[in-house]
């Protein structure tokens, strides 16, 4: 008798053919997957390189910005000092003057004061002289309150000028303020 039952562990010819076809179909799929993987790895390497370049460029920009700020501070002080040199020259000339002419010395001091004021203004240092203005605790320091005809809390007199630099108070003005009636 002939055995018509097939052994389940032995592949049939049909199974072998389908496995060959599957293997042949899998080969291009594997090649495609390998190609896609290689392409993805190349893209990752490219992006990593781009990231490192961008990071280095950002660091360079940050360093250049710090250098620029440092130079700006240095040269701002240099410019301010240059504006003060004529004041120094005038004071030295006054000290060396032996004429004894009080009017001439006073004229020289007034000129020196104008030079100093000009130098400070070029450095954006501006005097606060608030007579008649409403008292502002950010710009004024009240020394006393006095009875006055002016509106209450108005600056009556300035004992010492205050100064600002670029809208920032260097020194508040020392003032006397009108007392409420």
From Swiss-Prot:
Polar residues composition bias: residue spans: 1-12
Region (Disordered): 1-33
GO CC entries: cytosol
Keywords of this entry: Chaperone, Cytoplasm, Stress response
Gene Ontology BP terms: protein folding
Location, primary (coarse class): cytoplasm
Keyword Chaperone: yes
GO MF assignments: adenyl-nucleotide exchange factor activity; protein homodimerization activity; protein-folding chaperone binding; unfolded protein binding
Location within or outside the cell: Cytoplasm
Signal peptide range: none
InterPro entries membership: GrpE (IPR000740), GrpE_coiled_coil (IPR013805), GrpE_head (IPR009012)
Pfam family, any one: GrpE
Cytoplasm listed as a keyword: yes
Comp. bias intervals (Low complexity): 21-33
Family: Belongs to the GrpE family.
NCBIfam families from the UniProt entry: PRK14139.1 (NF010737), PRK14140.1 (NF010738), PRK14150.1 (NF010748)
Subunit structure: Homodimer.
Annotated function: Participates actively in the response to hyperosmotic and heat shock by preventing the aggregation of stress-denatured proteins, in association with DnaK and GrpE. It is the nucleotide exchange factor for DnaK and may function as a thermosensor. Unfolded proteins bind initially to DnaJ; upon interaction with the DnaJ-bound protein, DnaK hydrolyzes its bound ATP, resulting in the formation of a stable complex. GrpE releases ADP from DnaK; ATP binding to DnaK triggers the release of the substrate protein, thus completing the reaction cycle.
Protein name: Protein GrpE
Native source species: Burkholderia cenocepacia (strain HI2424)
Lineage start: Bacteria, Pseudomonadati, Pseudomonadota, Betaproteobacteria, Burkholderiales
Gene that this polypeptide is encoded by: grpE
């Amino acid at each position: 008798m002939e055995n018509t039952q097939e052994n389940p562990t032995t592949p049939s010819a049909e199974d072998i053919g389908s496995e060959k076809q599957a293997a042949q179909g899998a080969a291009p799929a594997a090649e495609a997957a390998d190609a896609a993987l290689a392409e993805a790895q190349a893209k990752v390497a490219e992006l990593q390189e781009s990231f490192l370049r961008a990071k280095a460029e950002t660091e360079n920009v940050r360093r250049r910005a710090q250098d620029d700020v440092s130079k700006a501070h240095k040269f701002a002080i240099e410019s301010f000092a240059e504006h003060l040199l004529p004041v120094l020259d005038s004071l030295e000339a006054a000290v060396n003057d032996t004429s004894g002419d009080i009017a001439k010395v006073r004229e020289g001091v007034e000129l020196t004061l104008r030079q100093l004021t000009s130098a400070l203004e070029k450095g954006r240092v501006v005097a606060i002289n608030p007579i008649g203005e409403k008292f502002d605790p950010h710009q004024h320091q009240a020394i006393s309150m006095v009875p006055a005809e002016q509106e209450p809390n108005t600056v009556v007199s300035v004992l010492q000028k205050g100064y600002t630099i670029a809208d920032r108070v260097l020194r508040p003005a020392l003032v006397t303020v009108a007392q409420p009636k």
